């Protein structure tokens, strides 16, 4: 099985909260697709709660689009990582890390303005696979954590995993 790019970076030295360009691809028609690692938690030291990450998934996807989409950027998808330490964001365009960090920070401020769980978008049996598994309180706690710590930038060259550690 091929080694995925996300496993070629050293998770023991990753900063969080932090933005990292995980991959840039060019389509056959010439469009750039950028995948960002939006790391909310320090790997193996912090973790997002299942209910909190689910609520963030519903809120973060919309708020990031409000703050980042424009003439040269369109978000395709924002999905939680299986390890529950962050999200991957795929988009058309090549915004820089600081633009993404600014949009992320603004989105966390927006999360804090949501005061009633009943106003979370798509939180119903028809549009959500586990609509009862949400926590606005946990999402607020995560948003406050990101705002208080600020958002750093992780560079791939600083995180390159030593080849001796690959496929242990």
UniProtKB/Swiss-Prot annotation:
Protein name: S-ribosylhomocysteine lyase
Job description of the protein: Involved in the synthesis of autoinducer 2 (AI-2) which is secreted by bacteria and is used to communicate both the cell density and the metabolic potential of the environment. The regulation of gene expression in response to changes in cell density is called quorum sensing. Catalyzes the transformation of S-ribosylhomocysteine (RHC) to homocysteine (HC) and 4,5-dihydroxy-2,3-pentadione (DPD).
Catalysed reaction, written as an equation: S-(5-deoxy-D-ribos-5-yl)-L-homocysteine = (S)-4,5-dihydroxypentane-2,3-dione + L-homocysteine
Subunit structure: Homodimer.
Family: Belongs to the LuxS family.
GO BP: any one term: quorum sensing
Keyword Phosphoprotein among record annotations: no
InterPro entries on file: LuxS_sf (IPR037005), Metalloenz_LuxS/M16 (IPR011249), S-ribosylhomocysteinase (IPR003815)
Keywords of this entry: Autoinducer synthesis, Iron, Lyase, Metal-binding, Quorum sensing
Molecular function via GO: iron ion binding; S-ribosylhomocysteine lyase activity
Superkingdom of the source species: Bacteria
EC number, as in UniProt: 4.4.1.21
Residues that bind Fe cation: 54, 58, 128
Cofactor note: Binds 1 Fe cation per subunit.
Lineage, top ranks: Bacteria, Pseudomonadati, Pseudomonadota, Gammaproteobacteria, Pasteurellales
Cofactor needs: Fe cation
Species assigned in the record: Mannheimia succiniciproducens (strain KCTC 0769BP / MBEL55E)
């Amino acid at each position: 099985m091929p080694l995925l790019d996300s496993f070629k970076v050293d998770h023991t030295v990753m900063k969080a909260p932090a933005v990292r360009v995980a991959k840039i691809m060019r389509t056959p028609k010439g469009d750039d697709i950028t995948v960002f690692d939006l790391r909310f938690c320090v790997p193996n030291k912090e973790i997002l709660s299942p209910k909190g990450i689910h609520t963030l998934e519903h809120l973060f996807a919309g708020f990031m689009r409000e703050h980042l989409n424009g003439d040269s950027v369109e978000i395709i998808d924002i999905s939680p990582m299986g390890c529950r330490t962050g999200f991957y964001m795929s988009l058309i365009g090549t915004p820089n890390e600081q633009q993404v960090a600014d949009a992320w920070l603004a989105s966390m401020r927006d999360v804090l303005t949501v005061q009633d769980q009943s106003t979370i978008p798509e939180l119903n049996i028809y549009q959500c696979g586990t609509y009862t598994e949400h926590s606005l309180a946990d999402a607020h706690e995560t948003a406050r954590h990101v705002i208080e710590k600020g958002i750093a930038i992780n560079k791939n060259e600083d995180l390159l995993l030593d080849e001796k550690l690959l496929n242990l």
